[in-house]
Each structure stands twice: as C-alpha cells, then as structure tokens.
C-alpha cells in the first residue's frame, strides 16, 4: 500500500481533472491511499469530488498580482504541511501552478508532474517581454529540476524541449 497526493489547480470539467479523478479511483481500487490537494476551490463545488479525500488550498483565485503572489506562498506552506503530515510515497501533479508547488515542496516522495498543453502557445498571451522571459525561465528551471515529467503528447514534449530547453531525458510521453 502506497500513499499518493494528487495536486491540481482546480477541479472543473477539463481533461486534466478527469484524469486526476480516474487515477484517484484507480489507486483506491488497487489498495493504495490517495488524497487530492486542490489549489483553489471548496467542498461541494464539483460533483466529481464526491467520495474523494480532498484538501483545498484556498476558496478562490486572486486576480491582483500582489494578492496572487501571497496566495501562492500560502498554498506552498499548506501543501508543505499536508505532505509532512501524510508522508506520501508519490506526489503527482497536473497543470503549471500545481507542478511548480509540487517541485518546490521539500520531500523524499517521488514527484511526477504532468504537462497537458503546448505551453509556448498558451503563454503567447503574455505581452510584456520581461514577464514572458521570466515565465520561460521559470518553466525551464522547473521541468529540468524534476526527472519525472509526463507530457500528454509528442507535440507537448517537443515544445518543452525546443521552446523551453527542458532536457529530453526528463520527459516521458
């Protein structure tokens, strides 16, 4: 029996959310002990979380840059405490904010992060050059720090390598 923490930004009706919920039930059916940490949301917000052990980091996403930054620090410390209390064998995360927090949290657990989007396309909306450059540097640093990056397609993997300089040996499709 292994303990898992599955980390995601929020639970709505997207593909990453569906994968997380299916994986949670798969783990539980196979005798493992899974937990879910949702960065933003609240109990009862999604029908998908019925009969799922969920911890919520905050009730909503902040839009103000300063408040958003403070919220990220609070989420990090909340996840760090949950990891210390549960002592998971594996932490599996979905989506960028969750991936960053998972990579940063200190633990001996195996960390697996997943990338579901072509990030260079996703971040074209960032118009300020310095902000885009910092975002690209953070993505490169983050995914090079983790040797268990799961890309949902070859296109996503190729984008991480070409656009962000992530080492190919860190990425599995």
Q: What are these language model-derived features?
A:
Residues 90-92, 106-123, 150:
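Active-site proximal beta-strand in glycosyltransferases
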Residues 77-81, 130-149, 165:
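Membrane-proximal helix-turn-helix segments that form the acceptor-binding/catalytic region
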Residues 75, 93-99, 115:
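Short His-centered aromatic/hydrophobic patch
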Residues 6-14, 18-67, 156, 164-172:
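N-terminal strand-loop element at the rim of the active site
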Residues 53-78, 124-131:
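A short, charged, and often flexible helix/loop element on the N-terminal side
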Residues 83, 87-89:
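Proline-aspartate-enriched helix->loop->beta-strand connector
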Residues 1-5:
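Extreme N-terminal starter segment of soluble prokaryotic enzymes
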């Amino acid at each position: 029996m292994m303990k898992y923490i599955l980390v995601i930004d929020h639970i709505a009706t997207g593909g990453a959310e569906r994968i997380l919920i299916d994986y949670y039930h798969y783990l539980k059916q196979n005798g493992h002990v899974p937990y879910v940490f949702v960065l933003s949301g609240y109990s009862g917000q999604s029908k998908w979380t019925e009969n799922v052990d969920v911890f919520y980091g905050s009730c909503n996403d902040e839009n103000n840059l300063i408040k958003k930054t403070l919220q990220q620090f609070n989420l990090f410390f909340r996840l760090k405490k949950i990891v210390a209390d549960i002592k998971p064998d594996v932490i599996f995360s979905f989506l960028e904010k969750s991936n960053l927090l998972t990579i940063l949290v200190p633990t001996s657990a195996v960390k697996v992060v997943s990338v579901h989007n072509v990030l260079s396309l996703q971040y074209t909306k960032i118009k300020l050059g310095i902000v885009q450059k910092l975002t690209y540097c953070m993505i490169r640093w983050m995914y090079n720090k983790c040797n268990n990056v799961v890309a949902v397609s070859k296109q996503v993997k190729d984008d991480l390598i070409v656009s962000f300089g992530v080492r190919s040996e860190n990425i599995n499709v």
